[in-house]
């Protein structure tokens, strides 16, 4: 049998990693062994970041809803409880958008929440 030389596969594997390390500084871009570690760590950070992004946005929405609810004389928890009792099912993303862009609409929602809490 003929001897199999693996130069092509090795070059392809190295090129793939070094392409992913584009934009890194110094050895992290140029040296395969260092670049491979840098790429693996970067992919770990990216994976973690995709999970954190969901948490961060939910926290931002809650902060915005809370600020708008307090302007209308309610705390966040009482506002959300009032909406639940009033049968209004809007998610936090939509409520935060209404709070930022449509103050009058949010005030109307707050009044409905107050009415449901009083009843």
UniProtKB/Swiss-Prot annotation:
Tell me if Cytoplasm is a UniProt keyword of this record. Answer: no
What GO cellular-component annotations does this UniProt entry give?
Answer: ribonucleoprotein complex; ribosome
Picking any one GO molecular function of the record gives: rRNA binding
Q: Give one Pfam family.
A: Ribosomal_L20
Give the record's keywords alphabetically: Ribonucleoprotein, Ribosomal protein, RNA-binding, rRNA-binding
Look up keyword rRNA-binding and say if it applies.
yes
Q: Which domain of life is it from?
A: Bacteria
Q: Which GO terms describe its biological process?
A: ribosomal large subunit assembly; translation
Q: Which residues cross the membrane?
A: none
What is the role of the protein in this entry? Binds directly to 23S ribosomal RNA and is necessary for the in vitro assembly process of the 50S ribosomal subunit. It is not involved in the protein synthesizing functions of that subunit.
Similarity-based family: Belongs to the bacterial ribosomal protein bL20 family.
What HAMAP family does the entry give? Ribosomal_bL20
Protein name listed in UniProt: Large ribosomal subunit protein bL20
Classification lineage: Bacteria, Pseudomonadati, Pseudomonadota, Gammaproteobacteria, Lysobacterales
């Amino acid at each position: 049998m003929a001897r199999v030389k693996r130069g092509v596969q090795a070059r392809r594997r190295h090129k793939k990693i070094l392409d992913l390390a584009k934009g890194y500084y110094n050895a992290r871009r140029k040296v395969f062994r260092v670049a491979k570690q840098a790429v693996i760590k970067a992919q770990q950070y990216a994976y973690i970041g995709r999970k954190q992004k969901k948490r961060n946005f939910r926290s931002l929405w809650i902060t915005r809803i809370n600020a708008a609810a307090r302007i209308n004389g309610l705390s966040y928890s009482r506002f959300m409880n009032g909406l639940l009792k009033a049968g209004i099912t809007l998610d936090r993303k939509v409520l935060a958008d209404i709070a930022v862009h449509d103050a009058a609409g949010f005030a109307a929602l707050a009044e409905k929440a107050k009415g449901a809490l009083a009843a």
